[in-house]
C-alpha cells in the first residue's frame, strides 16, 4: 500500500523499454476515427504521448504479458503500446463506432491473431482469461469493473480518478482509508505509481487521474466466506465514526447478523474499542471470522 508519486521513475520498477518504438499519434487516431469524446458517457481520450508511453513501463519484470486485457480501448492509442509488450491483446469496447474503427485500424494485428476485439459493455460481457490487465477505465464504473478484475489474481495497471486510486492504496489510520482500501488490499498490494493531470486527456475531465498498480497477494489471514467478509467490512464502515463494538451492533441488518451481541462478547476488546478506519485488513478478517461463527 504505497502512496502516490507524480511522474515516478518507471525504470526503478521494471526493465520494459519502449525507446525507439514508433507508435500511432493519439490525435491522429481521433481524427481518423472522427470522434472528439463525450464526458456525459465517461469518454475522455488519453492523448499525452508521454503518459501513454510510460504506462507499459510500470509492469514488473515478473509480470506475465502473454495475454493483456484492455477495457475501454477507445481509438487504440494505448492498444498500440500494449501490442509492443504483449503476445496477445484483447480489448473490450462498448462504442460500436470505435469498435469498428479498431477493427479497421488494427486489421493486420487482428489477422495475425495478436489482437482480439470484443464489442460490448465490460460489465455485461464474459471477461476472457488474461494474464494482466492494463486499462484506462471508464471512471463511472471503475469500482464495479475492478471488483470483477481483482479476484482474477492477475496484475493490474489501470487509470482511475486520483481520489479513488488514493483510497484504494490508503493505509489504516488515514482519512482516505475505508471500505475500498480494505476490499482492494484483500486481493492485492495496491500502489499509486503516477498522477495524471486533466490536460493529458481530451476532453479534459474535471479531476486529476491516477495510475494504480495492483499486484496479487496471498493474505496473511484466512477468510472462509469471502462474500460475508466483504459485506461485513462494508457494514462496519457505514459507521466509521463509531467504535467497532457499536458499529457491529448497529449494522447487523447490513452484515446480516442474527446475534451481533454474541459477536461483541467473543471479540477482542482491543479491536472493539477502535474505529473502522484504524483496523487492518487482517484485523477485519479476524472480526469477520468471529462474526460468521457467532453471529449467524
From Swiss-Prot:
Residues annotated to bind S-adenosyl-L-methionine: 44, 46, 72, 93, 121, 136
Region of interest (Disordered), ranges: 1-25
The EC number(s) this enzyme carries: 2.1.1.-
CDD domains from the UniProt entry: AdoMet_MTases
InterPro entries per UniProt: KsgA/Erm, rRNA_Ade_diMease-like_C, rRNA_Ade_Mease_Trfase_CS, rRNA_Ade_methylase_Trfase_N, rRNA_adenine_dimethylase, SAM-dependent_MTases_sf
Keywords per UniProt: Cytoplasm, Methyltransferase, RNA-binding, rRNA processing, S-adenosyl-L-methionine, Transferase
Main localization, broad class: cytoplasm
Role according to the record: Specifically dimethylates two adjacent adenosines in the loop of a conserved hairpin near the 3'-end of 16S rRNA in the 30S particle. May play a critical role in biogenesis of 30S subunits.
NCBIfam families: ksgA (TIGR00755), PRK14896.1-1 (NF011486)
The protein, known as: Probable ribosomal RNA small subunit methyltransferase A
Organism: Haloquadratum walsbyi (strain DSM 16790 / HBSQ001)
Annotated gene: rsmA
Amino acid at each position: 500500500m504505497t502512496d502516490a508519486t507524480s511522474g515516478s521513475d518507471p525504470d526503478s520498477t521494471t526493465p520494459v523499454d519502449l525507446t525507439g518504438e514508433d507508435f500511432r499519434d493519439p490525435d491522429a487516431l481521433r481524427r481518423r476515427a472522427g470522434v472528439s469524446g463525450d464526458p456525459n458517457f465517461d469518454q475522455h481520450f488519453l492523448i499525452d504521448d508521454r503518459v501513454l508511453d510510460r504506462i507499459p513501463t510500470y509492469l514488473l519484470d515478473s509480470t506475465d504479458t502473454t495475454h493483456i486485457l484492455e477495457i475501454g480501448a477507445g481509438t487504440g492509442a494505448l492498444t498500440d503500446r500494449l501490442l509492443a509488450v504483449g503476445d496477445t491483446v484483447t480489448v473490450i469496447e462498448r462504442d460500436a463506432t470505435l469498435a469498428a474503427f479498431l477493427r479497421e485500424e488494427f486489421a493486420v494485428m487482428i489477422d495475425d491473431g495478436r489482437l482480439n476485439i470484443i464489442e460490448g459493455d465490460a460489465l455485461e460481457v464474459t471477461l476472457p482469461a488474461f494474464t494482466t490487465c492494463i486499462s484506462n477505465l471508464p471512471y463511472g464504473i471503475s469500482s464495479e469493473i475492478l471488483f470483477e478484475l481483482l479476484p482474477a489474481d492477475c496484475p493490474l495497471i489501470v487509470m482511475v480518478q486520483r481520489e479513488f486510486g488514493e483510497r484504494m492504496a490508503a493505509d489504516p489510520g488515514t482519512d482516505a482509508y475505508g471500505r475500498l482500501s480494505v476490499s482492494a488490499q484483500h486481493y492485492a498490494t495496491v500502489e499509486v505509481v503516477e498522477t495524471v493531470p486533466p490536460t493529458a486527456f481530451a476532453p479534459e475531465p474535471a479531476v486529476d487521474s491516477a495510475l494504480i498498480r495492483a499486484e496479487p497477494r496471498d493474505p496473511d489471514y484466512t477468510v472462509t466466506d469471502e462474500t460475508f467478509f466483504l459485506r461485513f467490512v462494508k457494514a462496519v464502515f457505514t459507521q466509521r465514526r463509531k467504535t467497532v463494538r457499536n458499529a457491529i451492533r448497529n449494522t447487523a441488518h447490513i452484515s446480516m447478523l442474527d446475534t451481533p451481541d454474541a459477536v461483541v462478547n467473543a471479540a477482542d476488546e482491543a479491536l472493539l474499542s477502535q474505529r473502522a478506519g484504524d483496523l487492518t485488513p487482517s484485523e477485519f478478517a479476524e472480526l469477520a471470522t468471529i462474526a460468521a461463527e457467532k453471529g449467524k
